[in-house]
C-alpha cells in the first residue's frame, strides 16, 4: 500500500470501513458528516443483551457486549448499508445500519469474539473473523444465512507460544490473507476466491507461509508470552506488526507472488507488551503504544509512547514519551494521526495530543475512565469512548489547544470497543451488552 493511501478508503470496489481502522494502513475512520447533537436511535439486540460465558485462567465468567477492539465493519452491499461485527455473545452479527434489524441470522462460534472483523475489500461477499474458540474463519453472506466456507485452528501450526485466540484483524490484498494469531505466529494464505456455477462465492485457501513472531533473543528477554494481538499494517512492500513481548518488526513481502519467502527487515524491542496496532504517517514513521506490565528496565528507558524510523534500523527511535503511572498501565488504544498531531489515549484515562515532530505533549484531556477505545476522526472531529460508559466528540480544528468537547452520550457499560462513523451516525459497542447507533434527532 502506497504511503499516499494513508487516510484514504481501502480501494474503490466496496464503499465502507472494512476492517479495524478501515484500511491496510489502519488510518481511515469513516465518512461524515459527524452528528452534532446525537441521541441513541437504536440499540442491538432489541431486547436481550449480547452475553456468553468464557474461561479466563480456568475460571468461567460471563462477558457482555463488545470489547477491545470491537469496531464494526460498515459497508454498502446490495443497496443496503450493512454492519457486521462479532461480540461477547460468541456470535457474528449481520445488521441493517439504518434500522438495527438483522439482515441475516447470527453465526455462532464457540467462544467470545474480541477483535474487529474484516470484510473482503474486492467485492466478494466474505467476512474474515477470529474467535476465542481458537478458530479463524471465512464466512459468506450471499445467501439467506451466513455460511462457514473455511476455518483454521491456532494449533494447526507449529511451534506455537502462549495462546490460541485470534484477536487481530486480518488483511486481504491481491488474493492473499494476512493473519496474526495469539499462537504467536504470522500466517499468509492464498485465498483462491471465485464463484461456483450457481453464482455463490467459494474459497480454497492454501497456506503460503507462516513464521514465528518471536526470536530467541526476545524469549531470553521476556519469556514465552509473545502472542500477537496487534492488527497487521502494510505500508509499501513491508508488513509490520508487534507482539506481547514488545517486539516491533517489519517483513519484506515484495516477492510473495513470485514465491519468495518474506524476510525480516526491521526489529525493535519496546520492552513490554504491544497490543495496540502500529500506525504510520505519510513519511513512513511508525507510532507505537506500549503497555507497562513487566516493569523491565528497557520499558523504563524507552517509554510507552514511541516514534520509530524504520528507514534507520540501527537506531530507529526518534522520540519517546513516558506513561507508566502504575504497574499494568500504559497504552492499549491504537493512536490516531491528525495533521501535525499523534493522539494517544491511555489506560489512566488521559488523552495526549503530541507534536509528531518533536514528541512534546501539546495538550492532555482527562476522561472519566480508562481509555482502551481507539480514536475515530472524521471531518476534524474526534470520537472516543472510555470505561465510564461515555462516548465523546471533540473539536480538533485547532491542534495547538486542548480540543473542546462537542457532545457526549452515555451507555451503561465500559466502552473499550472502537467506534465507526458513517454518514451522520456513530456506531459503538459497549460492555453493557449492546451496540448503539447515535445520530441527530430529526423531527
Describe each region flagged by the PLM.
Residues 1-13, 20, 26-69, 73-167, ...:
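Extracytoplasmic/lumenal domain signature
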Amino acid at each position: 500500500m502506497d504511503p499516499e493511501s494513508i487516510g484514504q478508503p481501502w480501494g474503490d470496489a466496496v464503499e465502507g470501513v472494512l476492517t479495524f481502522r478501515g484500511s491496510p494502513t489502519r488510518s481511515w475512520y469513516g465518512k461524515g458528516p459527524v452528528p452534532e447533537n446525537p441521541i441513541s436511535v437504536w440499540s442491538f439486540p432489541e431486547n436481550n443483551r449480547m452475553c456468553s460465558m468464557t474461561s479466563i485462567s480456568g475460571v468461567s465468567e460471563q462477558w457482555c457486549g463488545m470489547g477491545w477492539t470491537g469496531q464494526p465493519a460498515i459497508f454498502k452491499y446490495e443497496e443496503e448499508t450493512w454492519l457486521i461485527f462479532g461480540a461477547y455473545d460468541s456470535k457474528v452479527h449481520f445488521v441493517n445500519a439504518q434500522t438495527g434489524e438483522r439482515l441475516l441470522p447470527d453465526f455462532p462460534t464457540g467462544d467470545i469474539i474480541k477483535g474487529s472483523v474484516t470484510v473482503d475489500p474486492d467485492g466478494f461477499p466474505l467476512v474474515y473473523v477470529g474467535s476465542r474458540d481458537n478458530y479463524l474463519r471465512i464466512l459468506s453472506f450471499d445467501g439467506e444465512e451466513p455460511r462457514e466456507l473455511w476455518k483454521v485452528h491456532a494449533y494447526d501450526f507449529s511451534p506455537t507460544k502462549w495462546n490460541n485466540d485470534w484477536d487481530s484483524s486480518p488483511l486481504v490484498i491481491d488474493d492473499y490473507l494476512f493473519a496474526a494469531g495469539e499462537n504467536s505466529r504470522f500466517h499468509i494464505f492464498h485465498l483462491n476466491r471465485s464463484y461456483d456455477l450457481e453464482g455463490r462465492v467459494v474459497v480454497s485457501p492454501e497456506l503460503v507461509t507462516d513464521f514465528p513472531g518471536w526470536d530467541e533473543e526476545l524469549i531470553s528477554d521476556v519469556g514465552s508470552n509473545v502472542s500477537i494481538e496487534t492488527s497487521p499494517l502494510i505500508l509499501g512492500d513491508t508488513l509490520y506488526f508487534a507482539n506481547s513481548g514488545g517486539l516491533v518488526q517489519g517483513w519484506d513481502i515484495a516477492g510473495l507472488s513470485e514465491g519468495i519467502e518474506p524476510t525480516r527487515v526491521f526489529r525493535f524491542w519496546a520492552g513490554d507488551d504491544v497490543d495496540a496496532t502500529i500506525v504510520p504517517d505519510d513519511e513512513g514513521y511508525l507510532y507505537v503504544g506500549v503497555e507497562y506490565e513487566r516493569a523491565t528496565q528497557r520499558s523504563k528507558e524507552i517509554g510507552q509512547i514511541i516514534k520509530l524510523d524504520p528507514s534507520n534500523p540501527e537506531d530507529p527511535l526518534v522520540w519517546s514519551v513516558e506513561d507508566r503511572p502504575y504497574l499494568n498501565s500504559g497504552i492499549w488504544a491504537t493512536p490516531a494521526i491528525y495533521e501535525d498531531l499523534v493522539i494517544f489515549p491511555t489506560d489512566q484515562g488521559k488523552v495526549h495530543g503530541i507534536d509528531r515532530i518533536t514528541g512534546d505533549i501539546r495538550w492532555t484531556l482527562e476522561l472519566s475512565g480508562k481509555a482502551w477505545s481507539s480514536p475515530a476522526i472524521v471531518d476534524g472531529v474526534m470520537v472516543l469512548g472510555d470505561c465510564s460508559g461515555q462516548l465523546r466528540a471533540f473539536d480538533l480544528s485547532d491542534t495547538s489547544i486542548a480540543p473542546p468537547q462537542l457532545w457526549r452520550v452515555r451507555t451503561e457499560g465500559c466502552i473499550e470497543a472502537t467506534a465507526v462513523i458513517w454518514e451522520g451516525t456513530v456506531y459503538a459497542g459497549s460492555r453493557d451488552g449492546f451496540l448503539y447507533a447515535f445520530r441527530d434527532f430529526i423531527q
